[in-house]
Structures are given as structure tokens and as C-alpha cells.
Amino acid sequence: MTYMQKLIANYKDKNLILKILVGMFLGAILGILTQKFGGGFLNGFAGFAEILGNLFVGALKAVAPVLVFILILSSIMTKKLGNATGIKYIITLYIVGTFLAACVGVAFSFLFPTTLSINDVVAADKTAPVNILVVLKDLFFKIVDNPLHAISSGNFMGILAWAVGFGIALRFCTNGTKKVFVDLSEATTKIVQFIIQLAPFGIFGLVCTSVYNTGLSTLAGYLRIVIVLVVAMAFVALVINPLIVFVTLRKNPYPLVFTCLKESGLTAFFTRSSAANIPVNLNLCRKLKLDEELYSISIPLGATINMAGAAVVISIMALAAANTLGIRPDFGTALLLCVISAIGACGASGVAGGSLLLIPLACSLFNIQNDVAMQVVAIGFIIGVIQDSVETAINSSTDVVFTAVASHKTNPKN
């Protein structure tokens, strides 16, 4: 064995989470040094780190659509469709979890009312959905997207629909054809495992770029809203989700919750993309020995509709806008906001800008003008380095938590 082979083998043997933490630490140090001192060498090294981060996220985003399509197609065409109950169960968990998260956001807004300084903020220039029907219409149109376009653009609702359709249609094909897709599935999985091994380098680049570009001074003016958002989402992750797990399985939920936060949430925090984190979640489900028929569908589905973090963000930011304008919603309006936030959050992945551009939709409930609402969206983009990171971590880790619950509930042997 050559020295390079020994080095690679030694790297692969080390704990992935430990390697990611080392990458985070080194990336933060490089970002701070480059921001403070600059210089040709440091700037060049930081630029190289940014390339590493972009390559990592790009690789995950590139492989995720192909992985989802092949896994679902091969799973449906080669195995018995015996877990329809599990799919219904996971969808129910996604809906209940997202609605409860919206309720948490509203509750925290009433407990810790927050106002925003919106006069000096330039309104975001993207177009937001006009009403909830627009969000739902966009989702339905994504389902009937061209399959090649769906894969190339990362439209996971379209990928899910076409993978299920092709899988059912090919269930009666020859064993030779089935073996081809099984082999493709295994090959794609190996590629994903290789990309995940490179996560420490990608995280190093992402952290370095984030610290260098943003620092802490920009966020200081919006510290209160950031704290309320983060604490509310942490409450969802550490109280609401464990409560759902305990009520469902009647056992200690925290080993599962902490495992999902550590192995899924940590990566999602830095990639800031539920779609890019799909391969990580599928790999974690495999490690947890969950039902493959279930998780091959529930994980990409969760990346599209399970948006607990987004529901928190939409409700808190909308109520912050209302508080800023002196609007005091009653209980009925707040409850309606929970419903709108939950439904809107389910469509967040179908909107460019995610949950932030659905804030005007929630603001319309209080008759807040769109130009004011878009200034709130702009604040969301300013604090996005924290808000979007925590939101994605909650969204993505919850996918695995609920998948594990459904898998254990419908198949106790897992």
C-alpha cells in the first residue's frame, strides 16, 4: 500500500462528524483572519475555500435528483408495495409537525413581541406569491413537469411523480431490466457515499465564506428577531419533535432526535439546502436500518413538504411586521395564521427564496401593504446566514426523525 493509499484509508476511518467539526473550526479561523487582515495569500486561500464549498454543495445538488429518481424507481419496480400505510403515516406526521411548528412560531411571537426597523431597508426585488392558491398551483404544475427538466432543475415533486409512475409501469418488465436499475441504484449510492466523505472540505469552505462575507456586525441590529427565531426553532427540534416521537412510540425520543440533529442537521446547517441534504438523509436512514421502501420516498417528499422551520419563520416574521405597524391580532386571526403558515411552508420549496418570499402571503392576513412586507423579506435575507441555516437544519433533520417514527410504527422489527 502506497503512502497516498494509507492516507486515504486513514481519512476514511476517522469519524465523519469529528472531521466536519474540524473543518468548521478551521473555516471560521480562516474567515476571521481574512476579514481582519486580508492580504494576497489569505484572500487567495479564502477564494480557494469558497470554491471547495461551492463544489461540495454543487455536487450534492447534482447527484440528489438522479439518486432520488433511481432509488424510488428501482424500489417500486423490484419490491412489494407493502408499506402504503407507512407513507400515509409519514405524510400525517409531516402535516401535524408543520402545523405545530407554526403554532410555536405564533406563541413565541406573543410571548416575545418583536418589532423591526424597516425604514432604511431596501425592499427585496423578487416577486412573492399573491395568495395560497398560487403556491398550491405551482406545486401541482411541478408534479406534471417534463421528467428530464424535473431532474435537471431539481424539481423533486416532479421527480417523485415520474419515478413512481415509471416504477409502477416497469413492475412487470423482465428480471434483466430490473437488475439494470438495481445496479444503477447501487452505483449512485456509492457516488453519494464518496461525496459525503468530502463533506469536511465543503463545510470548511462554506464556513470560511460565510464568516468572511457576513461577520457579526451586520446581524447585530437584528439580534432580537434572530434570537426569537432560533429559540423557537430549537423548541420545535428539542420539545415538539421529541413529544411527537414519545406519544407515537412510547419510548425515550432523544437518542433518535440527537442522532438526526448531529448527522443530518449539522450538514444541512451549512449547505442551507434540503435538496442538497437528501443524500445525507438517505445515508443516515440506511445507517439506522429503516425501511428502504419507506425512506426512499419519504425523504425526498419531506424535502418538499416537511417545512417545520419555514412555518416558524413565516409566522414570526409576519407577526413582527404586524407588531411594527401597531397591529394586534386576536386569537382567531392568530390561529388562521398558523394554518396559512403551515400550508405556505409546505410550498416553500416550490418558491425561489423559500420561506422568506411567503412572508407577504402571511402579512396579507393583516392587510399589510406589499411594499412593507417586502422590506420584511429583505430583513430576512440579511439575517439569512443564521435564519436559513437553522431553518434548513430543522427541516432536514425532522425528515429523518419522522421517517424513523413511521418505520418503527409500521414495522416494529426495524
Swiss-Prot record:
Membrane-spanning segments: 15-35, 56-76, 90-110, 150-170, 191-211, 225-245, 299-319, 339-359
Record key words, sorted: Amino-acid transport, Cell inner membrane, Cell membrane, Membrane, Symport, Transmembrane, Transmembrane helix, Transport
Domain of life, source organism: Bacteria
Chief location category: membrane
Intracellular or extracellular location(s): Cell inner membrane
MF (Gene Ontology): neutral L-amino acid:sodium symporter activity
Membrane topology, record value: Multi-pass membrane protein
Catalytic activity: L-serine(in) + Na(+)(in) = L-serine(out) + Na(+)(out); L-threonine(in) + Na(+)(in) = L-threonine(out) + Na(+)(out)
Role description: Involved in the import of serine and threonine into the cell, with the concomitant import of sodium (symport system).
UniProt-recorded name of the protein: Serine/threonine transporter SstT
Species the sequence originates in: Campylobacter hominis (strain ATCC BAA-381 / DSM 21671 / CCUG 45161 / LMG 19568 / NCTC 13146 / CH001A)
